[in-house]
């Protein structure tokens, strides 16, 4: 589907059963994802270290490609979350990056949303000159203001004891 597209930056978020209707097997799906990270012209790769398939993707990346990693659990990543807390209002985490650290308080729900935000922060960091503390503070402020899209981990009811969310995820991995 993307043969004619030249990518500058590629992000590996995960490898799940989500698109097995399109791919014949997990192995075939993984191999197709790896093609993105070996494509001509790629200059940056952003990799989720929390996914078991991450090492396979990392091993496929050419040495000329600048690589950044992110994680909600692993402090060895280039960008990672410290003291991550999920709440009934969303989440709070301290994000550590090569250009500094900052706190994000988001209105998004679920670990997958925090992980996706770390991917976005990683892309931003990859394009910045090093040691620009103000930029990470501004980025954390912007990220904290994001809201979920309609129908995806969206609050539809809230009382003092129960928060009701609607999510149209169609696979078990989409509900994590």
Descriptions of predicted regions:
Residues 1-3:
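Conserved helix/coil segment N-terminal to the catalytic DExD/H
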Residues 151, 166-176:
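Glycine-rich phosphate/pyrophosphate-binding beta-alpha loops
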Residues 6-163:
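Acidic, Mg2+-coordinating active-site environments of NTP-dependent enzymes
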């Amino acid at each position: 589907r993307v043969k004619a597209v030249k990518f500058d930056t590629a992000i590996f978020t995960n490898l799940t059963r989500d698109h097995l209707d399109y791919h014949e097997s997990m192995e075939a799906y993984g191999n197709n994802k790896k093609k993105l990270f070996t494509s001509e012209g790629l200059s940056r790769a952003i990799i989720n270290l929390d996914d078991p398939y991450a090492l396979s993707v990392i091993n496929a990346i050419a040495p000329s490609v600048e690589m950044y990693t992110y994680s909600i659990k692993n402090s060895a990543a280039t960008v990672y979350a410290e003291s991550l807390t999920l709440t009934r209002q969303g989440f709070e985490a301290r994000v550590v990056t090569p250009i500094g650290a900052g706190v994000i308080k988001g209105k998004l729900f679920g670990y997958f949303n925090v992980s996706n935000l770390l991917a976005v922060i990683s892309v931003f960091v990859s394009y910045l000159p090093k040691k620009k503390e103000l930029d990470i503070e501004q980025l954390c402020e912007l990220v904290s203001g994001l809201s979920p899209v309609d129908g995806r981990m969206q609050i539809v009811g809230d009382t003092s004891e129960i928060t009701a969310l609607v999510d149209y995820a169609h696979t078990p991995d989409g509900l994590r």
